[in-house]
């Protein structure tokens, strides 16, 4: 049994492994009106953290589909309060809550369930009409934006193409279990065995993705789909945070020629770069996770030229 202090004790198993809590609120906005949440411009509001990879997915999809005027968004303070969780405020890159005047995101959770005792997480899709959370599932929010909000989108992008949906789901699950959540399973492990098991799985999958990207510009061909963005949010944080802070240090993403070129390629797609805030990312992880980093010192690096030429245009081909 592990006796080491866990970052989130309720999500820690006796063998030292971290097992993430399930999303608590999973209602759906439907274009066909089959739920209490129809697609209406201006009705829904997205609460996010620029530090959080799960929230970052929804920010990117909202941006790529041109939903900014249809779905409002408010960013929380990257430094999560130890007692109350995510906090609104006035600072660089974050702001007060303009919808409800909440001080803490917990207040949104309390509006749905005053007895909720789980961890307060982002993203949150809020319904301004019923004054309730529709969803705190990044998976579902992404998919709603992709499939239900199409009438409000001003950009012709298909991030969930029908011919690849089965393959997308399979690769999504692999990337989630071994990379997206895998870095957390390594970083939040409280036993050597649990850490090594998770860390090796991270690099097994990164190695496989490096090979896959040798002859394919994106994971499914010439155009990026939702799986690429699910992977991107971990890759963009990897060398700055997960390599050192979470001890996933066999290799950096910069050491993978294909993955690093792919990362730069995605980063350079119009609209994506401004969704990335390394100040928020580093301050959140290194300051908030004081069980891992008790000094709360935030590192100054790494230096990454994400705007450098990537050369991956040569791999473009028809999907």
Identify the residue ranges that each predicted region occupies.
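C-terminal alpha-helical interaction module
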Residues: 1-319
């Amino acid at each position: 049994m592990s006796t080491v202090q866990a970052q989130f004790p309720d999500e820690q198993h006796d063998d030292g492994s971290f097992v993430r809590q399930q999303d608590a609120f999973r209602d759906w906005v439907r274009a066909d009106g089959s739920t209490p949440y129809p697609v209406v411009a201006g009705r829904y509001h997205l609460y996010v953290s620029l530090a959080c990879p799960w929230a970052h997915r929804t920010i990117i999809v909202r941006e790529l589909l041109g939903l900014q005027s249809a779905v409002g968004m408010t960013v929380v303070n990257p430094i999560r309060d130890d007692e109350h969780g995510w906090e609104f405020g006035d600072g660089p890159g974050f702001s007060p809550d303009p919808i409800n005047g909440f001080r803490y995101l917990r207040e949104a959770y309390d509006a749905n369930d005053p007895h909720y005792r789980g961890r307060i997480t982002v993203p949150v899709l809020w319904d301004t009409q019923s004054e309730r959370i529709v969803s705190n599932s990044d998976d579902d929010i992404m998919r709603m934006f992709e499939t239900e909000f199409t009438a409000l989108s001003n950009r012709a992008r298909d991030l969930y193409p029908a011919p690849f949906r089965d393959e997308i789901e399979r690769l999504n699950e692999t990337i989630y279990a071994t990379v997206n959540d895998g870095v957390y399973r390594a970083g939040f492990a409280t036993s050597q065995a649990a850490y090594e098991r998770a860390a090796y799985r991270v690099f097994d999958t990164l190695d496989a993705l490096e090979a896959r990207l040798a002859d394919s510009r994106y994971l499914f061909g010439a155009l990026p789909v939702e799986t690429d963005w699910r992977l991107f949010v971990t890759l963009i944080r990897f060398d700055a945070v997960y390599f050192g802070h979470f001890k996933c240090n066999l290799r950096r993403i910069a050491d993978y020629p294909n993955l690093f070129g792919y990362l730069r390629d995605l980063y350079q797609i119009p609209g994506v770069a401004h969704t990335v805030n390394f100040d928020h990312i580093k301050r959140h992880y290194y300051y908030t996770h004081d069980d891992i980093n008790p000094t709360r010192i935030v590192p100054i690096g790494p230096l990454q030229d994400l705007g450098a030429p990537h050369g991956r245009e040569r791999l473009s081909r028809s999907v």
